[in-house]
Amino acid sequence: MSTPHWFDQGSLVLASNNKGKVAEFEKLFEQLKLPVEIIPQGRLNIPDAIEDGLSFIENAIIKARHASKISGKPAMADDSGICVPVLGGAPGIYSARYAGEHGDDAANNAKLLNDLLPFRKNGEAIEGMFVCVLALVTHAEDPLPQIFQGIWHGEILEAPRGENGFGYDPLFWLPELQVSSAELSKEDKNKISHRGQAMQLFRESLQK
């Protein structure tokens, strides 16, 4: 296993102020046992970037560059959300502010359920997928950001289930396990989730 040169800087900024994401990432990075300190951007008083991209990849890169520019350190950003094909992929990149106010999970869930009412027919399942894109930049103007993408397929429930997780987890049903994402432990979720998948690709990149 070769050592990435950004390891030499001794730290990596995690470009997120979302407490739920930060908690999941801290657990995932703990499992990786990287020889670098992982610093959530909030500890450096880095404000959220303006996410004006049109895709998960664009927004992840924007956030990573923003954190790296302010901190002067390598940075990793996550852009993620839930996509529902019958809604044309919505909420998509607007998942965190689907109902208008950023980070209002209850309102976002309620809006998604309401928007899906016209599509509920004869108990048919409505497909959904969680998407996570990780972008790693070694410096703010890195011309070759590393991109890692995970997609987690499931269905959208008619009512919330479970108390764990955050965001749309209570509405995300895993038919093969017969549980919602919010009924999984953090450890079990990280093994199979969109974010866990993307982190696994990141882990594999470190072994090349």
From Swiss-Prot:
Its EC number is 3.6.1.66. It is an enzyme of class 3 (hydrolase). It comes from the Bacteria. Keywords: Hydrolase, Magnesium, Metal-binding, Nucleotide metabolism, Nucleotide-binding. GO terms for biological process: nucleotide metabolic process; purine nucleoside triphosphate catabolic process. Gene3D superfamilies: 3.90.950.10. The keyword Phosphoprotein does not apply. The active site is at D79 (proton acceptor). GO terms for molecular function: dITP diphosphatase activity; ITP diphosphatase activity; metal ion binding; nucleotide binding; ribonucleoside triphosphate phosphatase activity; XTP diphosphatase activity. Transmembrane segments: none annotated. Substrate binds at S16, N17, N18, K19, G20, K21, S80, F166, G167, Y168, D169, K189, H194, R195. The keyword Lipoprotein does not apply. CDD domains: HAM1 (cd00515). Its cofactor is Mg(2+). Mg(2+) binds at D79. GO terms for cellular component: cytosol. Pfam families: Ham1p_like. NCBIfam families: RdgB/HAM1 family non-canonical purine NTP pyrophosphatase. Belongs to the HAM1 NTPase family. Pyrophosphatase that catalyzes the hydrolysis of nucleoside triphosphates to their monophosphate derivatives, with a high preference for the non-canonical purine nucleotides XTP (xanthosine triphosphate), dITP (deoxyinosine triphosphate) and ITP. Seems to function as a house-cleaning enzyme that removes non-canonical purine nucleotides from the nucleotide pool, thus preventing their incorporation into DNA/RNA and avoiding chromosomal lesions. Homodimer. This is dITP/XTP pyrophosphatase. It comes from Acinetobacter baumannii (strain AB307-0294).
